[in-house]
Amino acid sequence: MSTGTYPYKMFKMDVTNLNKVEDVEIERLRAERELLRRQKEAAKNSSTNGSVNIEGTQDSNDLQYNAHLFKSSNPKEEYDSAIDVRNDISQDEDDYKRTNDVNDSYRLVRQYEAPKELLNEYADESYDPMQERQSKKQIQDRESDYQKQRYDRQLTPTRVDAFQPDGTQSNGRSYAEVMRQVELEKEERRVHMELNQRRREGTLKEVEEEESISDKKRELELNNTEISQKPKRSRWDQAPPSVTQVSTTKRRSRWDKAPENFTISEHVIENGISEDLINKEVNVVEEKLRPPVRLLTEEELNELLPSEGYAILEPPPGYLESIHPELLQKGTTLDTYHVPQEQELPLEKELPAALPTEIPGVGDLAFFKQEDVKYFGKLLKVEDEAKLTIAELRERKILRLLLKVKNGTPPMRKSALRQLTDQARDFGAAALFNQILPLLMERTLEDQERHLLVKVIDRILYKLDDLVRPFTHKILVVIEPLLIDEDYYARAEGREIISNLAKASGLAHMIATMRPDIDHVDEYVRNTTARAFSVVASALGVPALLPFLKAVCRSKKSWQARHTGVRIIQQIALLLGCSILPHLKNLVDCIGHGLEDEQQKVRIMTALSLSALAEAATPYGIEAFDSVLKPLWSGVQRHRGKSLAAFLKATGFIIPLMEPEYASHFTRRIMKILLREFNSPDEEMKKIVLKVVSQCASTDGVTPEYLRTDVLPEFFHCFWSRRMASDRRSYKQVVETTVVLAQQVGSRQIVERVVNNFKDESEPYRKMTAETVDKVIGSLGVSEIDERLEELLLDGVLFAFQEQSVEEKVILTCFSTVVNALGTRCKPYLPQIVSTILYRLNNKSANVREQAADLVSSITIVLKACGEEALMRKLGVVLYEYLGEEYPEVLGSILGAIKAIVSVVGMSSMQPPIRDLLPRLTPILRNRHEKVQENTIDLVGKIADRGSEYVSAREWMRICFELIDMLKAHKKSIRRAAVNTFGYISKAIGPQDVLATLLNNLKVQERQNRVCTTVAIAIVAETCMPFTVVPALMADYRTPEMNVQNGVLKSLAFMFEYIGEQARDYVYAITPLLADALMDRDAVHRQTAASVIKHLSLGCVGLGVEDAMIHLLNILWPNILEESPHVINAVREGIDGIRNCIGVGPIMAYLVQGLFHPSRKVRNTYWTSYNSAYVQSADAMVPYYPHVDDDQFNNYDMKTLHICI
């Protein structure tokens, strides 16, 4: 131990002795410790100065200080000789720890806390592995490197609209200029590749050496003509020496000119946008705000420094300035502090320290991010709009609306989106797209923001129509990446935008715009362009695009063009599906020659496109593929690797289209190649081989004997292995292929080969076996399974079920499928199965207990069929004892098992008795877990339906109170089960008490609870007859409370919907109530009353209550001019219901009055109802058309229509 440090040593002591130490003793110890610390410091200083060893003094002080704390005569015996580095140090061994105070003193009071193991356990439980994924909301965080190539594309300059009706052309690049630019890029790429190739080969070195030699000679000649001068290193604070140089003609560079009034919008209009353009405007502003370098004046120094206590000193003689004056005159920029001038202060105020959420002219936003400053920074500046030009005002208005859409609240977004849509043509296409498209190219964009901006483009495309033509390519650059997004809804949005764009621009303009990208040097651009062309074909029709596709696929200029053309046809097949059948022959002819193309990529893509066409056309269209069968077969024999995989895939999709004899012939020929490729090390090849085998095996021409002798042995040898089971995709394909083979050769051939795998030590292998057996036996049954195989099967499944350690339910599903398929044949094995279930119900693992309970639910029917009611009663008693389970998932499974046993055994034979079981279920209803709630309510409903007499009415009422809370559950199935259970209970104990409980529930504030209560009341009315409910509802309607009255009306609506024709008996009783509701000031009242009338009238069609319906129609009709969409829809439905009840004639008398009203809104309302009547009752309306007198020119009266047969 070093002499200059305090000896921190761990020692043992008794806690009781420490608790008995008096305060005085503690103070004495503190004083001694302080004295010891001072001695240590003095010793340290002396050892530093004179290197004196004071170890003996230190030990004596330790002995004097610690003597009363140890029972041993030698205190060092109690010391630990080493620091324990274990994680599980006990509390007694860790009594005293060093604190962080200055004195480095010991703690005098024990510190108690939970063990580290327990703390670590809770820490692990709180860890959420998906939290990092959820926090990454930006799109670029989940994109692959291939998808991120979209940031490398540029928004090209605006292109000329060659299809303007007036014949004039707008400013922009023509098609010829675009093609020249594309050719220039190709040539540049070719030169770079050639240079790299020569550099690798070493042929470029000699040219470089010759150039370097000539450069050196030129330098020597220049040096001879100039005055020899020793070079001197330049300093930043010295002016460069003046050297007279010969004026030479210098080429003017565009970088010599400083940008003026540079904005993103103007640059986008002229030259497009690149990745660095986003920050360019900000850099220009910073360049303008950067102050010139100058010396501080006396006034500025007086402001910075205090005036008192300071004196201005004269420079000493010989002082030289560190910054040369000539450098200052040249305006060199140095990072020095400066005092802002008055004209600079407003510019600094424009950049706020914190990001605001309330923007002038926009309002209070939901959020405002740092990235938004790049695009919406102009809105942060408060400017006088009277001094702005019309274009600047339009730009600021568009920015405000876009900011509302992007960052605003839902009402704000809705209003801004409507304004952008309505004023799209007023704003103009250039002003809109030059602000929207750069936003969509932002790297930090999130899914919700992109969705909203894409919605803006979708809306304004309808309004702009052909005005979008100059911006077609820009829109495609932004939208095409959506077509390869992993999100399905993003792909759907992209297809919708491109479809609308194609309809607005026209096919000719779309082809002219996308033609340069077909043979682009970048594969990413070609891929997205092909997908966009497929969307254009689906929008404008495949026949319109076929001539262009035929020319592209036969291009001799570029193999990239042929490759892209074939890919377009592949994407058309994937997008349109069976809709390609009318054009199948032409599409196959377009790409058929590609199977023999000189480029391998074109051949592969052609084969893949043919497979997509065949898959889309299944099971028709074999005639269209006649021309490609021979090239396909020769390619299968000739190619290897990826090319062979593509050709095999195409052949596999075409064979099922053939006639049985041809399919059998081709299958036998291709199966030899497939068997050879079974041993291929390539994973993709194996997947394709499996798919082709399943397709060939499912054809009609292939015999089971051929598959059994030639295919199955090699198939199981190569594919049924542990390595294949560990790969999820291969595992799934192997299972599907095995099931297809089983359907041809029978279940026994497959089960015999895989049954021994149930006892394999690899769990993924056992799981693959279980899934295969489950699907094979589930589809083919066990009629081919003999007794020995049956024994092996049950033994293997039971072993796999006992040995499983994963939470998946594959083996459980297989177990239940096998047991239910065997039926009574598995009776000898039931005691062993039940004993296994009972043993696993007592397992410490919650997952094991849950699966054991689920297995009980699935085999109860077999237990009943085998007559093992004693086993079921035993299981019921055991499960009843486990109703105190703490894990909700396990408890839900136990309740499901009890429900299955109750359904099979019956109420009278159930053990435990129903009178003991139901009271245990009442407190479980309070459990908020969805699985527990659903199974509990279903069980209670079964008991109420079949065994209500075993339980007292008081217990049923207690359950009713608990069920009321279930009416507001989030899951729909739980709410439905609760409502049905109310009907069973009301049927069991009478509707009075249940109805009173439900009517009281109408007074709560929660709307969902009230709606579910109204449905429950309707169920009670349907179960116990309406006359038991209608008087109570009509009496409760008198309650002067809005929620209660609305609830009563809604209950009547549901009730009349349920009871149908029984409503005829209550029409006249309920009419005054409905008349009062239709004349209420509350719109919701009138809406709900109109719904009641709809259901009431539809239930009384042809039952002779037309007078009451006409009375209700007279009160309902004035509401036809309501503006609320919900109210007007309910009113129209009520009118349609009355029309079906009383006929279309009286309704026509009402409708004719407003069909030709001067007001457009009135006409629209009446014509909507007229169109609905015309759709349903066109023939019945003819006699009720208004009579129009003839005039001198026209005869409106047709005599034949007056004839009634």
UniProtKB/Swiss-Prot annotation:
One GO cellular component term: catalytic step 2 spliceosome
Subunit structure: Belongs to the 40S cdc5-associated complex (or cwf complex), a spliceosome sub-complex reminiscent of a late-stage spliceosome composed of the U2, U5 and U6 snRNAs and at least brr2, cdc5, cwf2/prp3, cwf3/syf1, cwf4/syf3, cwf5/ecm2, spp42/cwf6, cwf7/spf27, cwf8, cwf9, cwf10, cwf11, cwf12, prp45/cwf13, cwf14, cwf15, cwf16, cwf17, cwf18, cwf19, cwf20, cwf21, cwf22, cwf23, cwf24, cwf25, cwf26, cyp7/cwf27, cwf28, cwf29/ist3, lea1, msl1, prp5/cwf1, prp10, prp12/sap130, prp17, prp22, sap61, sap62, sap114, sap145, slu7, smb1, smd1, smd3, smf1, smg1 and syf2.
Name this protein carries in UniProt: U2 snRNP component prp10
Pfam families: PPP2R1A-like_HEAT, SF3b1
Any Gene Ontology biological process: siRNA-mediated pericentric heterochromatin formation
UniProt function note: Contacts pre-mRNA on both sides of the branch site early in spliceosome assembly.
Source species: Schizosaccharomyces pombe (strain 972 / ATCC 24843)
Family statement: Belongs to the SF3B1 family.
Polar residues bias locations: 44-58
Localisation per UniProt entry: Nucleus
Molecular-function GO terms, alphabetical: mRNA binding
Top-level taxon in the UniProt lineage: Eukaryota
